[in-house]
């Protein structure tokens, strides 16, 4: 009788162990699947590509479909920054990595924006031509084609710099749509506060061009001058 219970107990324990192992294996597979983010040779572990000869930086991003209808002043924000959910494109690169990549590509940061002068100063620095591409896109679209300015004005994107402020604030801001003292790149067409404070302009993604929510894409920054 004791032997029977001993055998049954051992079989039960073995079954529990198998279930536990299977469960852990399933969790590992789910985690690996969730962790794998890849497109056009870039990934969450290698989100930037620098071509110093052609003066370009290419970044892996993901579309945030909310801002195909809602307004935002945030073009691209690092996904783990405090503003990571507020941008049209969620970036996989950190502000520091992006800043260093632009310098490696030949860009010169303007470093003219401060918290004190932000509402009266237009960002300076190397001018950037920005394009966006994704699987199935008809072409690489310019930033002006994928972002709608309610005033119909052209974007004037500049390598502002601001790495110290970016690391202090930890917002994750990579590309802002008005001049910004924190974002690595921002739009010299408007001064800070034009969107959220003074209501001079509204920005959103161009839903007639951009793909669906969560689509992976690449954004390429070319040093223009």
From Swiss-Prot:
Gene: ydjY
Keywords: Signal
Protein name as catalogued: Uncharacterized protein YdjY
InterPro entries recorded: 4Fe4S_Fe-S-bd, YdjY-like
GO CC terms: cytosol
Cited NCBIfam families: ydjY_domain
Record carries keyword Signal: yes
Signal peptide: 1-22
PROSITE patterns to which the protein is assigned, alphabetical: 4FE4S_FER_2 (PS51379)
Source superkingdom: Bacteria
Claim: Lyase is one of the keywords in the record: no
Domain 4Fe-4S ferredoxin-type: 161-190
